[in-house]
From Swiss-Prot:
GO molecular function terms listed in the Swiss-Prot or TrEMBL record: structural constituent of ribosome
NCBIfam families: rpmI_bact
Organism lineage: Bacteria, Bacillati, Actinomycetota, Actinomycetes, Kitasatosporales
Family that this chain belongs to: Belongs to the bacterial ribosomal protein bL35 family.
Entries under InterPro entries matching the protein: Ribosomal_bL35, Ribosomal_bL35-like, Ribosomal_bL35_CS, Ribosomal_bL35_sf
Protein name: Large ribosomal subunit protein bL35
Gene name as annotated: rpmI
């Protein structure tokens, strides 16, 4: 039986911490930023934790 491959798109978008949480980047901070307020762009910085149901699906895609 061959090894399972992890989903390459998911592996680029998500990161699993040592404790098992799944982190993602917040959407909406790539381009078209000049009309967005500083408050919005500041709120979009940093990583967010995935909801438990979604995290289970992502872990399956990553083979964890």
């Amino acid at each position: 039986m061959p090894k399972n491959k992890s989903h390459s798109g998911a592996s680029k978008r998500f990161k699993i911490t040592g404790s098992g949480k799944v982190l993602r980047e917040r959407a909406g901070k790539r381009h078209l930023l000049e009309h967005k307020s500083s408050r919005v762009t500041r709120r979009l910085t940093g990583n967010a934790e995935m909801a438990p149901g979604d995290a289970a699906k992502i872990k399956k895609l990553l083979g964890k």
